[in-house]
Every structure is written in structure tokens, then in C-alpha cells.
């Protein structure tokens, strides 16, 4: 894998406090990472201007709002996300087959081939078997992840968000063309933070991840550009 292929796999999580910081990171990294992730906190604070700021720098956006509501509401929200010009958007697979089908159909109908790719969140990387048990799910994490990934594929979703530990299982169950976006990726120079099911960038790519969501190891670095370059180095070295 060459450096350009490796950098395109990196999604930088914009866990920042406002437009000025978005502008700074987008200016620094738009030609060094594949995409920028905008999540609930940032979008709630800054709204669509967060997306517009990244796009002004030529960056691509993963809008990570994890929609989970009645089918019609989620479909309308997904359409609004698509109208912002994002490349990836997601919802919770636990919302069920009808919710996912309705959203996927609505976006395909309005945008066709120019649509964003739609992802379903399986089980959050902070979750454990005990987390699931306490909400009444008595199946192992890995089993639930694969079950939800297969449901998402059946519903017409383009891929899933899942921990790196389940990449291989999802790839086996859902095939080579199903997108896998994985948080919980930590380069060798970074701490584990609050993620429970983690993996190194090169291991995740070898397992079959299409995109790696990485935030704090880049944002907390004294030199974010150098941090990205080090992550690219790890991917290239581990994925010849």
C-alpha cells in the first residue's frame, strides 16, 4: 500500500469546540487525511456551518450523528444530511430493518449515484458484554455486531461502523464490497483512552477496514501533521 492509499483511509475525528478550530484543522489536514468526522457535539454547537467549513478547504465529511428514530423521521434527517454534501452519514442498526430500509431508499431515490454512502452503527466500541447484558441483550458482542451488520446489508446500507475486533467477522459475513469504518484505532504512540475494543492502524487495515476513525492521537499531538504522517508510516509499513 502506498502513502496516498494509506492517508485516504484516515478519518480525522473533529472533536473540537467551534468553527475556528474546524477551520484550523481542515486547513492543516485536508490534503493529508481522507475525511473529517463531525459528530453530535460539534454539529449541535455549530450546525451545518461545521460541514461547510470543512468543504471550503476541499475536505470530505463523515457526518456521525447516529440517527435512531421512527423510519420517516430518520429518512428525512438522512436526506438533509445528503443535501449538506457529506460523503458518509450514519444511523443506528438497532433502529431496525424498516428504519434502515426507509432511509436508504429515500436517499437513493433523490440522489442516485451522487448520494453519500450510508452506514449503520453496530455496537459502540465503548460497550462490553456487561453493557449489553444490562440492557437485556444476552448475546455476545461479536454475535450482535455480525447480526446487525447482516441486517444493515439486507436493508440496503453501504456498510457499518464497528470495532476493529469484529472487522474480520463482518468481512466474512457481508463480503468484500461492504464498507467497514472502524473507530477504536490507536497508533503505537497513543494511549487507549476510553475505547474498549482497540487495534493498531496497520492491523485494522490488514483485517479489512476501509476507513479508520482517529481523533485524539492527532488532535492532542504537538504537531498534528506529524502525527498523521506517523500513522501513515505505520499503515504503509504493516501493509506492504
Swiss-Prot record:
Pathway: Pyrimidine metabolism; UMP biosynthesis via de novo pathway; UMP from orotate: step 2/2
Key word ATP-binding present: no
Positions of the catalytic residues: 66 (proton donor)
GO molecular function: orotidine-5'-phosphate decarboxylase activity
Residues annotated to bind substrate: 15, 37, 64-73, 125, 186, 195, 215-216
Origin: domain of life: Bacteria
Keyword list, A-Z: Decarboxylase, Lyase, Pyrimidine biosynthesis
Keyword Ubl conjugation tagged: no
Database matches in SUPFAM superfamilies: Ribulose-phoshate binding barrel
GO BP annotations listed: 'de novo' pyrimidine nucleobase biosynthetic process; 'de novo' UMP biosynthetic process
InterPro entries, per the entry: Aldolase_TIM, OMPdecase, OMPdecase_AS, OMPdecase_bac, OMPdeCOase_dom, RibuloseP-bd_barrel
PANTHER family reported in the protein's UniProt record: OROTIDINE 5'-PHOSPHATE DECARBOXYLASE
Family: Belongs to the OMP decarboxylase family. Type 1 subfamily.
Functional summary from the UniProt entry: Catalyzes the decarboxylation of orotidine 5'-monophosphate (OMP) to uridine 5'-monophosphate (UMP).
Entry-linked HAMAP family: OMPdecase_type1_B
Protein name (record): Orotidine 5'-phosphate decarboxylase
Species of provenance: Pelobacter propionicus (strain DSM 2379 / NBRC 103807 / OttBd1)
